[in-house]
Amino acid sequence: MAEEHKHDESVIAPEPAVEVVERESLMDKISEKIHHGGDSSSSSSSSDDEDEKKKTKKPSSPSSSMKSKVYRLFGREQPVHKVLGGGKPADIFMWKNKKMSGGVLGGATAAWVVFELMEYHLLTLLCHVMIVVLAVLFLWSNATMFINKSPPKIPEVHIPEEPILQLASGLRIEINRGFSSLREIASGRDLKKFLIAIAGLWVLSILGGCFNFLTLAYIALVLLFTVPLAYDKYEDKVDPLGEKAMIELKKQYAVLDEKVLSKIPLGPLKNKKKD
């Protein structure tokens, strides 16, 4: 009996060690699962982040491509304000300073009314204005002796040199550019530019027969004060119409080129280019 009791104890004794080993193995497995789960979750989260970044990046490419493909009238790549020069003249034409713009347009309108409707001549108007100004100042200066008041302070007027030089330089550059364009058109290198120049001069000759130079200048000034501002507000509606018109003009020019212009003999400069 004692031997059996010892044998039973020897059999029962190892059980706690086995249980400890099993528990350790279970803990290891659980920790491994937790570790792998964290890795997978982190990898999945990183992959999700990458997917989200891709999703956010994908819509930007078509919008940028659409922006680059938007047609602008006359192929402009800058705002209307920059096209007009971007300085004070552009501010006036775009009505950035409403008082100054209204003053310039009102002065031009008054001058047109005086010279065109009232049929005043420029030299006559200048002489009459100078007569009135000199007479008023002369009488005022002499009248101060009798009424014991100070004479009028007549300001000294000087024309600054720098603005005049800048204006002359700008005019010189534009005139030289116009001369070079006319020379290029007359040399026979570009038939398309030649036809555009002839059509433009023909339209101007018709307008010149209907209006005098002062009226044409006033109409051009009014257009400068109205058309750029209206186009800047409604460019999204005007540009598609301009694109359709340009496509139609190109089609008509292609037909004209095929039937008429291609049969016209070109100048020697064009033949030299081909050689």
UniProtKB/Swiss-Prot annotation:
<dbReference type="GO" id="GO:0005886">
    <property type="term" value="C:plasma membrane"/>
</dbReference>
<keyword id="KW-0812">Transmembrane</keyword>
<feature type="transmembrane region" description="Helical">
    <location>
        <begin position="120"/>
        <end position="140"/>
    </location>
</feature>
<feature type="compositionally biased region" description="Basic and acidic residues">
    <location>
        <begin position="1"/>
        <end position="10"/>
    </location>
</feature>
<dbReference type="GO" id="GO:0009617">
    <property type="term" value="P:response to bacterium"/>
</dbReference>
<dbReference type="GO" id="GO:0098554">
    <property type="term" value="C:cytoplasmic side of endoplasmic reticulum membrane"/>
</dbReference>
<dbReference type="Pfam" id="PF02453">
    <property type="entry name" value="Reticulon"/>
</dbReference>
<comment type="subunit">
    <text>Interacts with VirB2.</text>
</comment>
<comment type="function">
    <text>Plays a role in the Agrobacterium-mediated plant transformation via its interaction with VirB2, the major component of the T-pilus.</text>
</comment>
<protein>
    <recommendedName>
        <fullName>Reticulon-like protein B1</fullName>
    </recommendedName>
</protein>
<dbReference type="InterPro" id="IPR045064">
    <property type="entry name" value="Reticulon-like"/>
</dbReference>
<feature type="domain" description="Reticulon">
    <location>
        <begin position="89"/>
        <end position="274"/>
    </location>
</feature>
<keyword id="KW-1003">Cell membrane</keyword>
<keyword id="KW-0007">Acetylation</keyword>
<dbReference type="GO" id="GO:0000325">
    <property type="term" value="C:plant-type vacuole"/>
</dbReference>
<feature type="transmembrane region" description="Helical">
    <location>
        <begin position="194"/>
        <end position="214"/>
    </location>
</feature>
<feature type="transmembrane region" description="Helical">
    <location>
        <begin position="99"/>
        <end position="119"/>
    </location>
</feature>
<dbReference type="GO" id="GO:0071782">
    <property type="term" value="C:endoplasmic reticulum tubular network"/>
</dbReference>
<keyword id="KW-0256">Endoplasmic reticulum</keyword>
<dbReference type="GO" id="GO:0005783">
    <property type="term" value="C:endoplasmic reticulum"/>
</dbReference>
<keyword id="KW-1133">Transmembrane helix</keyword>
<feature type="compositionally biased region" description="Low complexity">
    <location>
        <begin position="59"/>
        <end position="68"/>
    </location>
</feature>
<keyword id="KW-0472">Membrane</keyword>
<feature type="region of interest" description="Disordered">
    <location>
        <begin position="1"/>
        <end position="68"/>
    </location>
</feature>
<dbReference type="InterPro" id="IPR003388">
    <property type="entry name" value="Reticulon"/>
</dbReference>
<feature type="compositionally biased region" description="Basic and acidic residues">
    <location>
        <begin position="20"/>
        <end position="38"/>
    </location>
</feature>
<feature type="modified residue" description="N-acetylalanine">
    <location>
        <position position="2"/>
    </location>
</feature>
<dbReference type="GO" id="GO:0005789">
    <property type="term" value="C:endoplasmic reticulum membrane"/>
</dbReference>
<dbReference type="GO" id="GO:0071786">
    <property type="term" value="P:endoplasmic reticulum tubular network organization"/>
</dbReference>
